[in-house]
């Protein structure tokens, strides 16, 4: 994946000097073993580093300051092996800017009932040491994830792994840049938003560039025939290229121009260190084709993308791709396009004009050329494929004016029916809990028609991500009841309006 860092997660253990040097030495040794056990887990995608045993307010504060200033630290895992009086943590945690996960565990899994004495009891106090810590975290109104269970438990490691993926995506957003070619599709509301508020809240910036900047890269002498030849040869190796597009075919020139768009767009993004971008078909002056194939391939390399100027979805898609890195399944830009409203089974056909990522292809994509019927340009080249059946989700990041909301709908993708006259990439899914409830809830929540669609990212990861970001999360799943969902939205309206004023 392009521009993807591999930061660390710091494992931090809390105690106090009350117990003396012997027990503290044992606490440190045990904490290192716990950290090593987590580091060895294949369910956790980043390196877990035992950082410190903290026993004084100054030690705690200094470590939090160090974490803030270390660009390679994506977050902390905190555990209180013994009782660690929480007032010692006030100053440090009040300064901490990195996300943290509170692991409520203990070193030993089973109690040695016949051998327990007071030395054992004093050493293994996480049961109440973590409660003391939890009170302070709650008193300080700190967003965090609490994971409960023995550190060797696969389910515990999986939950930590979900948080680590969210923390990595948050780390990736800090200082990230997204390029907007042109503006919004005209008169569209949901793709608008406050980019200043977004940078304050999320840490990434979005800035506009004239499509002429892209046109100049596409036409650049730095992209010569050899580069185009090599990329076209790669297309023929990776995809089932239509005969008319192959070398010697009557429309091979269209494929070569599509390759030029990819080379120019890739050069622009790499030179500017961008992690994502948007386009709009209403602002393509100087380009012969709508960028289709280029966008699909850049998404497959990890770039975020949003159509029609949708910068929030571009940023969200990048975050979701980071979260899902290394997992089975893929993640793509998506749009709810049209419905199958048969009473025997309601389904959604998801697609876009061209820009669906090939990481969600069920089989080898075909590379084709067809008229688009919108945009007024030459016929664009594009990858055509069906998405696979299986559990998936749609996620949408929207600007509510006074806050941001992350909306998630869990879905079940089904086998795509034959679509011989629809030459675009597509997915078909059934909504949870059902079509009518899910669509009504989505509309009540103000969800966009653009989403990040993923087979690899889970609701838990997105919940952790929203928690780190300090934004509202609304989930539509198999348990959703519309009346309760609407009331939750009303409650959230009040909570997020007041929350900043009651933090202390």
Curated annotation (Swiss-Prot):
Mn(2+) binds at residues 308, 335, 352, 450. One of its GO terms (molecular function) is L-arabinose isomerase activity. Its cofactor is Mn(2+). The keyword S-adenosyl-L-methionine does not apply. Binds 1 Mn(2+) ion per subunit. GO terms for cellular component: cytosol. The keyword Manganese applies. GO terms for biological process: L-arabinose catabolic process to xylulose 5-phosphate. Pathway: Carbohydrate degradation; L-arabinose degradation via L-ribulose; D-xylulose 5-phosphate from L-arabinose (bacterial route): step 1/3. Keywords: Arabinose catabolism, Carbohydrate metabolism, Isomerase, Manganese, Metal-binding. Its EC number is 5.3.1.4. InterPro entries: Ara_Isoase_C, AraA_central, AraA_N, AraA_N_sf, Fuc/Ara_isomerase_C, Fucose_isomerase_N/cen_sf, Lara_isomerase. CDD domains: L-arabinose_isomerase. It catalyses: beta-L-arabinopyranose = L-ribulose. It holds the Pfam family Arabinose_Iso_C. Catalyzes the conversion of L-arabinose to L-ribulose. Belongs to the arabinose isomerase family. This is L-arabinose isomerase. It comes from Opitutus terrae (strain DSM 11246 / JCM 15787 / PB90-1). The gene is araA.
């Amino acid at each position: 994946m392009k521009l993807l860092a591999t930061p660390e997660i710091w494992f931090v253990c809390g105690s106090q000097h009350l117990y003396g040097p012997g027990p503290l030495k044992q606490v440190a040794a045990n904490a290192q073993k716990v950290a090593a056990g987590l580091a060895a887990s294949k369910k956790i995608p980043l390196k877990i580093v035992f950082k410190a045993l903290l026993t004084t307010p100054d030690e705690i504060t200094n470590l939090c300051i160090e974490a803030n200033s270390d660009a390679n630290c994506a977050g902390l895992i905190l555990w209180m092996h013994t009782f660690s009086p929480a007032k010692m943590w006030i100053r440090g945690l009040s300064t901490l800017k990195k996300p943290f996960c509170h692991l409520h565990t203990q070193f030993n899994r089973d109690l040695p009932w016949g051998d327990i004495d007071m030395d054992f009891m004093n050493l293994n106090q996480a049961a109440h040491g973590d409660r003391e810590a939890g009170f302070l975290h709650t008193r300080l109104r700190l967003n965090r994830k609490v994971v409960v269970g023995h550190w060797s438990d696969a389910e515990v490691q999986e939950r930590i792994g979900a948080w680590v993926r969210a923390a990595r995506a948050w780390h990736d957003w800090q200082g990230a840049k997204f390029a907007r070619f042109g503006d919004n599709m005209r008169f569209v509301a949901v793709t608008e938003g406050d980019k200043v508020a977004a940078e304050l809240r999320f840490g990434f910036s979005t800035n506009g560039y004239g499509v002429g900047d892209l046109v100049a890269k596409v036409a650049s002498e730095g992209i010569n025939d050899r580069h185009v030849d090599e990329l076209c040869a790669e297309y023929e190796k990776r995809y089932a290229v239509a005969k008319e597009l192959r070398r010697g075919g009557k429309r091979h020139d269209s494929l070569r121009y599509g390759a030029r768009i990819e080379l120019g767009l890739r050069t622009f993004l790499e030179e500017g260190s961008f992690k994502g971008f948007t386009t709009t078909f209403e602002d393509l002056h100087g380009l012969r084709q709508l960028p289709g194939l280029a966008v699909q391939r850049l998404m497959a390399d990890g770039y975020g993308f949003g159509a029609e100027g949708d910068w929030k979805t571009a940023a969200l898609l990048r975050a979701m791709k980071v979260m899902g890195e290394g997992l089975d399944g893929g993640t793509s830009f998506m749009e709810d396009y049209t419905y199958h409203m048969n009473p025997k089974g309601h389904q959604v056909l998801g697609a876009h004009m061209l820009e669906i990522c090939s990481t969600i292809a069920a089989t080898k994509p075909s590379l084709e050329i067809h008229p688009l019927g919108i945009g007024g340009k030459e016929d664009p080249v594009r990858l055509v494929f069906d998405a696979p059946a299986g559990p998936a989700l749609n996620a949408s990041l929207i600007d509510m004016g006074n806050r941001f909301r992350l909306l998630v709908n869990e879905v079940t993708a089904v086998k795509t029916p034959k679509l011989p006259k629809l030459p675009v990439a597509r997915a078909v899914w059934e909504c949870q809990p059902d079509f009518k409830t899910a669509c009504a809830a989505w509309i009540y929540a103000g969800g966009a028609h653009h989403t990040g669609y993923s087979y690899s990212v889970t609701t838990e990861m997105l919940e952790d991500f929203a928690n780190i970001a300090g934004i509202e999360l609304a989930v539509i799943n198999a348990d959703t009841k519309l009346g309760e969902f609407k009331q939750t939205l009303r409650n959230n309206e009040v909570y997020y309006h007041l929350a900043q004023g009651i933090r202390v």
